[in-house]
Amino acid sequence: MTAQKMSAQEIIAFIGNAEKKTNVKVTFEGALAAALPENVVKLGNVLFGDWKDIEPLLANLTENKDYVVEQDGRNSAVPLLDKRNINARIEPGAIIRDQVTIEDNAVVMMGAIINIGAEIGEGTMIDMGAILGGRATVGKNSHIGAGAVLAGVIEPASADPVRIGDNVLVGANAVIIEGVQVGSGSVVAAGAIVTQDVPDNVVVAGVPARVIKEIDEKTQQKTALEDALRNL
């Protein structure tokens, strides 16, 4: 699913102007004495909505006044992505904010964190615990390893985001610094910290990362992706 592409300035405006909400789920006993506000949903003895709308209702419960509140944020500006119509595999525990693009047959593993404005290309896998910061872009058929970080850039608005090309492998726990571009076909070794742009079809490693060789047949075999993992 392709979200509308937003510039840094548009993202800043989106967050700044958004109504801040503390969404809660409240299970209560007793009866409500007041009418429900329009934006509060009641299913049986469970309420869903913003705490500022629900709190007054709970203050006026009749009979039994017991209730339990479940919440996962406070004054949140950006909701989580609605994943129902995305043609990709997204495992439980992935945290994906709204205004993220996830193309067909991509894979997002448990524990991955994807911030607003990020883009994940067709057939790309974001492994466990990887972080894609705001506006980070990954091309097609790439693999971002477990625990890797693609630094986000929302502020300052003039800064360039991280861009990863097609058919790139970023190893576990590697860090790609703000504004860096990694060329298509390249490999970033596990644990590398990439502070400068990486050309196409090379292997980089180290802290800071440096080119150690060009991609050869042996490297291609060791870093080949498995299409079966992307089947839906």
From Swiss-Prot:
EC number: 2.3.1.89
Family annotation (SUPFAM superfamilies): Trimeric LpxA-like enzymes
Reactions that this protein is recorded to catalyse: (S)-2,3,4,5-tetrahydrodipicolinate + acetyl-CoA + H2O = L-2-acetamido-6-oxoheptanedioate + CoA
UniProt entry tagged with the keyword Repeat: yes
Keyword Amino-acid biosynthesis tagged: yes
Gene3D superfamilies noted in UniProt: Hexapeptide repeat proteins (2.160.10.10), Malonyl-CoA ACP transacylase, ACP-binding (3.30.70.250)
An annotated Gene Ontology molecular function: tetrahydrodipicolinate N-acetyltransferase activity
Protein's GO biological process: diaminopimelate biosynthetic process; lysine biosynthetic process via diaminopimelate
A Pfam family per the record: Hexapep
Keywords for the protein's UniProt record, in alphabetical order: Acyltransferase, Amino-acid biosynthesis, Diaminopimelate biosynthesis, Lysine biosynthesis, Repeat, Transferase
Pathway: Amino-acid biosynthesis; L-lysine biosynthesis via DAP pathway; LL-2,6-diaminopimelate from (S)-tetrahydrodipicolinate (acetylase route): step 1/3
Family statement: Belongs to the transferase hexapeptide repeat family. DapH subfamily.
Record-linked PANTHER family: 2,3,4,5-TETRAHYDROPYRIDINE-2,6-DICARBOXYLATE N-ACETYLTRANSFERASE, ACETYLTRANSFERASE
Function statement: Catalyzes the transfer of an acetyl group from acetyl-CoA to tetrahydrodipicolinate.
Name the record gives this protein: 2,3,4,5-tetrahydropyridine-2,6-dicarboxylate N-acetyltransferase
Lineage: Bacteria, Bacillati, Bacillota, Bacilli, Lactobacillales
